[in-house]
Amino acid sequence: MAKQSGADRELVIGSRGSILALWQAEYIKSCLKAQCGLQSRIQIIKTRGDKILDVPLAKIGGKGLFTKELEEMLLSKDIDLAVHSLKDVPVEFVPELDLAAITQRESANDCFLSVNYPNLNALPQGAKVGTTSLRRSMQIKKYRSDLDTLSLRGNVQTRLEKLHNGAFDAIILAQAGVNRLKINTQDVRYIVPLDFMIPAMGQGALGIEMRKDSIFFDRIAVLNDKQSALCVSAERAFVRTLEGGCQVPIGVYAQFSNNKLTLQAIVGLPDGSEVLQDSVEDSINIDDINASENLGIAFAQKFIDKGAKELLERAAKIAFA
């Protein structure tokens, strides 16, 4: 229980139970001790997205498939903080909650994994590519319309087993997860970053969600990485303006260099037959989160003017076949 008072008590970290989620929670636990002087323990919480494994994510519907139960535990004060893969975090919070910190971003790339084929171009016509994501499906089909993208659910180990068992010719994972779990070419013969693919908002970064009134909120904010927060804030503002969620075919990626923020994005149908794609750049101070959000909003409005919302409505009806 996290309901004990006192600024020096042990904190309770809420986490999903997958190996990747627990790696992330352990990482934050070590950061809390090293950088904040705080002791903590991890409490595993099963989410709706963890329980429903036989349905593609896009067909389950609803928001917060991997976060809602964690947020309920925050609100009831049964945990002090929740550690999320930021790409899974809805763009709107309940008023009592917010992100205390966004950690330094790992690689935001998506990654091609295969036992028999060295890259996406080497796959034969009709090859089966496994992915959880309409965004990935859209971009793979745009790149190679002859490939068959299929829903792939389960934790990373389950997905790798399906690849090894021949259910798929290749699978697509987030590069950050591959790096964190130290998956290498001894496990899978070919691991190739997909540089052409625009990632999901927040992909590669971790978010620490807390109650705003927590006495630990400001102490934990020291774990915030300014550059990652700046970029992710623009990405989340873009998706929020489009009224999209975590399971829709939207890719958006921000990069910050030399006081310039560059945003690139793609929106379209899951089969890649229709897409909108664009990029924008503006001068921004690294501390100016409002400016980065405004850039994301203005960029999204360009997409809306080109029919992005109508495209997303059609995409929602198609989902996975």
Swiss-Prot record:
GO molecular function, one term: hydroxymethylbilane synthase activity
Catalytic activity: 4 porphobilinogen + H2O = hydroxymethylbilane + 4 NH4(+)
Keyword Transferase: yes
Top-level EC class: transferase
A biological process term (GO) from this entry: protoporphyrinogen IX biosynthetic process
Cofactor, free-text remark: Binds 1 dipyrromethane group covalently.
Record key words, sorted: Porphyrin biosynthesis, Transferase
Entry EC number(s): 2.5.1.61
Pfam families (alphabetical): Porphobil_deam (PF01379), Porphobil_deamC (PF03900)
GO cellular component term of the entry, any: cytoplasm
Cofactors (names): dipyrromethane
Keyword hit for Ribosomal protein: no
Pathway: Porphyrin-containing compound metabolism; protoporphyrin-IX biosynthesis; coproporphyrinogen-III from 5-aminolevulinate: step 2/4
UniProt family annotation: Belongs to the HMBS family.
Binding partners and assembly: Monomer.
Function: Tetrapolymerization of the monopyrrole PBG into the hydroxymethylbilane pre-uroporphyrinogen in several discrete steps.
Other remarks in the entry: The porphobilinogen subunits are added to the dipyrromethane group.
Name of the protein described by the UniProt record: Porphobilinogen deaminase
Protein's organism: Helicobacter hepaticus (strain ATCC 51449 / 3B1)
Lineage of origin: Bacteria, Pseudomonadati, Campylobacterota, Epsilonproteobacteria, Campylobacterales
Gene giving rise to this polypeptide: hemC
